[in-house]
Amino acid sequence: MNMLLAMLINITLSLLLISIAFWLPQLNIYTEKANPYDWGFDPMSSARLPFSMKFFLVAITFLLFDLEIALLLPIPWAIQIHSINTMMLTAFILVTILALGLAYEWIQKGLEWTE
């Protein structure tokens, strides 16, 4: 009963805040918000600024290796299970796939900034 009441309150409060944000938008543009800031970007222009594809590829590579760390971090605790061979084989396959991907990126010169 308590969980149902908490869910009902959360949903009601969320819907109330969403409807207030939808029906009461800020219609006037202040001069401070209309001026460019820091880097000189126009705040009223399109939000989709062009970016370097090489930067995107390096960022994706970083995320993949960050995911590798997140997947391999629990290995010391997983050693306590009975099927240690299966766990180590899975970790070895994961590291091998990521190393092959890194080698492929390196060979294709995807990690270099110069054109």
Swiss-Prot record:
Membrane topology: Multi-pass membrane protein
InterPro entries: NADH_UbQ/plastoQ_OxRdtase_su3, NDAH_ubi_oxred_su3_sf
UniProt-listed Enzyme Commission number(s): 7.1.1.2
Membrane-traversing stretches: 4-24, 55-75, 87-107
Disulfide bonds: none
Keywords: Electron transport, Membrane, Mitochondrion, Mitochondrion inner membrane, NAD, Respiratory chain, Translocase, Transmembrane, Transmembrane helix, Transport, Ubiquinone
Catalytic activity, reaction form: a ubiquinone + NADH + 5 H(+)(in) = a ubiquinol + NAD(+) + 4 H(+)(out)
One BP term from GO: mitochondrial electron transport, NADH to ubiquinone
GO cellular component: mitochondrial inner membrane; NADH dehydrogenase complex
Record has RNA-binding as a keyword: no
Subcellular location: Mitochondrion inner membrane
Protein's recorded name: NADH-ubiquinone oxidoreductase chain 3
Organism: Neotoma floridana
Encoding gene, per UniProt annotation: MT-ND3
